[in-house]
């Protein structure tokens, strides 16, 4: 026996699991069979494990594993066999039961049966496929990954080779893995025959059913001679001819989802990500889609296409005719469908390999499916190079007659030498790109879609020419010059009959969702042979080319240019994220709108300025010079106000539409500047009327009367001047915080009429103008001749003086109002509560003091601030952590008392709450109603006695009961006695002024005046003349009161009766009679 030597297996053999009790056949140099369990390679002196020892080791491991399972009561999952191990297990199952005995390590060797060898063995390198002798068999039949090295010597350790013995009974192989070794992934097994491709389920809606086409592609392999019906690939590399498969994607036109999607065949290697450009410089485009358009009534249509040869520099055309028949029998629920597509062909020769790429079917009006990526941009061809045009057709529905679609293509400008097809998806959004850009952001050769205007004739629509006054004319790029530019593409659609509106709308809606990256032109025409047509031509400037758009629309169909353009606006869809969109430049839009406004204003006022339009003014005297200065400065002032309103104010309103400014910001900046503009427009014609008077000597126009007449209008400057400082602060904050606002105002500043003045300089003009009016009037008064004895000159000077005083008063009042507003704002800022600003609105600030002390209930004093305004009294106490504000309306104050004895320099303010005032008013109303009832039931009694003694009259009235109201009081202490007296006087005067202004002030009448005994003594002896002499008797009233006992017999009974009736009246009637008597006596 030879000495067995073993060696550890290499790491690549760690996953080997040789079966139990197997014999190994070793092919020696002498072609003899040796039955051995261990083999030694003497040349390499490398020790190898024999099969028997490995099997024994596996048995031991299996027993240990079973013992562990029994102890833990766990069942380990068995390995699923695949590949060669599966074949071995199948072979063991086919053997008879007699072969299941286990062979020992000393059993004679035997070869595996021939069926096993023919199933799993590979043919030896000798090349004899029919020789099945043991010398030609590989030693790794049962374990294809194991390596058992040959013995090059005939004898091992000098021992003779034993003779071959008959083969024992074959044993059952057990390919269990070793639990101690981590098995790597198994090498891939041969791929089985692939089944046919599945398709997506049929849509539930039968109306959306599509015509599907099945393509059987043949794959011819020269080595295996296998025919596959999945791919039509002819591999030229290694004697294989490869053909790219023709994928027919069928979807519905106008829908955003694909109904049938083929599944790509599996590849051994993952497909690389799509690249927009290949290494050879050709465009790699994904397969496009052949879409179908369902319709109910479709007649046979002939679609003609004209294409250009890619190799020729001149426009050579080839005509392809596609005929679509509608004689297709379809179920009642499924309408017939049309398949209309682009066909793009690319022919490239690389290393004698003919590859047909991009044999795709798609529709011009259908977007890509959601599973595909964005189609790449077309490769740009060199100048004067002609690119092939994809065959296109437009899906039509409800077409009564046969439309003809003709496509003519001219060369496209591009800087690459290789001619390249333009993808259908790149051409289809030209209409969308042309019509969906915002009007303000489009620069159509200096024009805009908003400039489209209908002419007087009904057969044409022409765009209006751009204004020559536009300061920013558009220029044509150098590449667009006639010498460098190439003619554009034209797509013309001609129809002999009327087209339904639904067709046009569906066509427009489909086009609006497509993206177009090619620089081509589109011409759409749909005309009627029996009716007049309307033609619209617009020259538009895109990024790199002009688009000539010609639209022939039948007016009988109710279509219009505005409807056609509005229907091509961008619509949101699932593919909208992949569309190429133009960004909206707000700055450009605003500048264009300002240019339009500037053009309008300059056209309305053809003359540059009002000052240049003034007639010549006589300035021979100093008085005329001052008047000339007033008129000229007023003309310039109006022009400046127009710049503010027409340009700056207009720009601010436009920026508010884009939320760059708010309406509150605009009001705070410009205030009531429009009112001031209209005041000046009213004053300016009056000033112009006095110019002819200046030509006459010794005549002075009554200019002062103009200012007197407009004195109330000048008071509108008050609110503007009071908020001017705040408006400048708001404007500066907006300019500093927003760059767009700053740029827009800077652009307005650069316009000619602005004269390089910013908005801050214009906003101060009204303030300067109002303050200049009194100065000019003062100069006019100085220029007047000295007063003479004439009444006219004296009256003239008086009017001038009056107008001057009035204008100065207006300015002072405005300045005082500004100062008052500043004080109010400082008060609001100091108090700092929420409602204080609203309560201080429309208040006049009178005085304040922060040295007043308030007496609390405990006896201590707190320093407070006392504010006296026109209608309220504020007591503000600023605590450490909290502010206390007490607001007392002046109308609620009952009295102010000097409490010097109780509190040094102290005053007490007694007032009512609002609730108490309401209750008091309600009680007064009830009392008045009760007194009215009593007076009606029991009238006052009057007793009149007429004797020789003086007459006495007694009147008794029911007085109203007084109402007891709980009053509140606040005790304050001033700094000194003088301040106390001043505060007492000021508060009392403010209360009385408020009562007078509101009409609640009552004059007290004493009881002596009410109970006066009126005795009229008349010296007239005629009783018939007493009624005519009442005035004379009243005139002598004061004298007759001292002589009551004289002429008693001459008392007129009528006078007594009149006096008695007057006594029955109320106190107001008595007072009126007394006043009448006094008036007559005077």
UniProtKB/Swiss-Prot annotation:
InterPro entries: DBL_dom_sf, DH_dom, RhoGEF_domain
Polar residues: compositionally biased ranges: 1-15
Biased composition (Low complexity): 20-29, 62-71, 96-109, 116-160, 170-184, 211-244, 282-366, 450-473
Organism per entry: Dictyostelium discoideum
Annotated protein name in UniProt: RhoGEF domain-containing protein gxcI
Biological role: GTPase-activating protein.
One Pfam assignment: RhoGEF
Keyword Transmembrane among UniProt keywords: no
GO MF annotation, one: guanyl-nucleotide exchange factor activity
Residue stretches making up the DH domain: 622-817
Region entry PH-like, spans: 838-994
Statement: the UniProt record of this protein carries the keyword Repeat: no
UniProt keyword list: Guanine-nucleotide releasing factor
Domain of life, source organism: Eukaryota
Coiled-coil blocks: none
Region named Disordered: 1-29, 59-78, 91-394, 438-488, 504-524, 920-961, 1017-1060
PROSITE patterns: DH_2
Gene behind this protein: gxcI
GO cellular component: cytosol
Domain note: The PH-like region is similar to the PH domain but contains an insert. It is unclear whether it is a real PH domain.
Biased segments, Pro residues type: 185-206, 262-276, 367-379
